[in-house]
């Protein structure tokens, strides 16, 4: 299938891009600038597109993001430290982010006569992000079937929606993902902080997958204390 991958430049979506390039006909990556403080992730998405020799579309929706106030990712709100399974991580929710991005990606796919859009939502996101859950994925597909009826037929591929980030690390390893060329940290500093939810989850995923983590962290060991109160099953 001719497939466009929604790629932020993070570990999950870059791994998905490499997987898609090996299993489908990857025809491009689409990324979004929504005013996120960690905009540097887009540079890693660009590197991925160049590596896989496909077009890279960066869609500027910062004006929209500016109205979705109250998130630590876009506003002057401190990014909390700790595990994603903690209630405090709800500060990182950008309301309706995936719905907005996927609607645009589906429009792009229809215009380019693509067969599918692939997105890297995964099981570890379910606790905090409602637009990463299977119910949302299924509902969005039904909505797009109606929205594009008679014009295009585009499938939503979400192969990681029921699996852990550790499983994505394992999958990325199989498909040759260069993990050092991905960016996760929400704080957007020169190095991964090692303390925010996405850094803790990233560090923990490599550990659980038994794969060496090439990432440079400002605090390489914080994840141990943050993750110690949760079982592997709880952080799916």
Swiss-Prot record:
Keywords: ATP-binding, Ligase, Metal-binding, Nucleotide-binding, Queuosine biosynthesis, Zinc. It holds the Pfam family QueC. One of its GO terms (molecular function) is zinc ion binding. Catalyzes the ATP-dependent conversion of 7-carboxy-7-deazaguanine (CDG) to 7-cyano-7-deazaguanine (preQ(0)). Binds 1 zinc ion per subunit. It catalyses: 7-carboxy-7-deazaguanine + NH4(+) + ATP = 7-cyano-7-deazaguanine + ADP + phosphate + H2O + H(+). The gene is queC. The keyword Zinc applies. This is 7-cyano-7-deazaguanine synthase. ATP binds at residues 7-17. Zn(2+) binds at residues 185, 193, 196, 199. Pathway: Purine metabolism; 7-cyano-7-deazaguanine biosynthesis. It comes from the Bacteria. Its cofactor is Zn(2+). InterPro entries: QueC (IPR018317), Rossmann-like_a/b/a_fold (IPR014729). GO terms for biological process: queuosine biosynthetic process. Belongs to the QueC family. Its EC number is 6.3.4.20.
């Amino acid at each position: 299938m001719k497939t466009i991958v929604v790629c932020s430049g993070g570990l999950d979506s870059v791994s998905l891009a490499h997987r898609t390039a090996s299993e489908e006909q990857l025809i491009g990556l689409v990324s979004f600038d929504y005013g996120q403080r960690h905009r540097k992730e887009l540079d890693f998405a660009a590197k991925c597109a160049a590596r896989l020799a496909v077009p890279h579309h960066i869609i500027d929706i910062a004006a929209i993001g500016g109205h979705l106030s109250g998130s630590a990712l876009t506003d002057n709100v401190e990014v909390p430290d700790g595990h994603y399974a903690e209630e405090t991580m709800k500060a990182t929710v950008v309301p309706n982010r995936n719905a907005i991005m996927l609607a645009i990606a589906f429009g792009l796919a229809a215009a380019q006569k693509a067969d599918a859009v692939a997105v890297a939502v995964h099981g570890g996101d379910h606790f905090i992000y409602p637009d990463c859950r299977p119910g949302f994925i299924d509902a969005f597909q039904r909505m797009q079937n109606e929205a594009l009826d008679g014009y295009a037929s585009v499938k939503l591929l979400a192969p990681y929606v029921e699996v852990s980030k550790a499983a994505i690390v394992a999958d990325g390893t199989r498909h040759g993902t260069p993990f050092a060329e991905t960016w996760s940290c929400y704080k957007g500093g020169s190095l991964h902080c090692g303390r925010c939810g996405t850094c803790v989850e990233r560090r923990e995923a490599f550990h659980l997958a038994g794969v060496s983590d090439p990432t440079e962290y400002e605090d390489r060991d914080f994840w141990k204390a943050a993750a110690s109160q949760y079982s592997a099953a709880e952080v799916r």
